[in-house]
Amino acid sequence: MSITLEIETKNYLDDLLCIKKHLSHMESLLNCYASYALSEPSSKFGWTFFKLEFKSNFQISISKKFSDILAKYQYNDDTGKFTKFMSDYFIARGCNVKVNSVT
């Protein structure tokens, strides 16, 4: 099962670069490559929205590697925990974005 996240940003180019950079680091850490896809952006009310789809092997690898952190999140479902983890991951690395799961 792959997870798709909706990313919201006010500074698309800078935050896109930040996200790509840190996803690349994550891919290297987990030995997964070409493991996510980005949609075309759309803008509304000063915000830019785009989707980030994780391929299942990348999502599973992240979940296994960081299972101890994911277990601490107060969500009932794995998708909610994964979404919160990725939001915290991007924010901790200077990406000024909001992250929501797409159902």
Model-derived features: positions:
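A general secondary-structure signal for short beta-strands and their flanking turns/coil
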Residues: 1-4, 45-49, 92
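Alpha-helix boundary/N-cap detector
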Residues: 14-21, 57, 61, 73-85
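Short, flexible N-terminal segments of the mature chain
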Residues: 16-40
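Conserved short beta-strand edge segments in small beta-sheet-based binding/regulatory domains
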Residues: 70-103
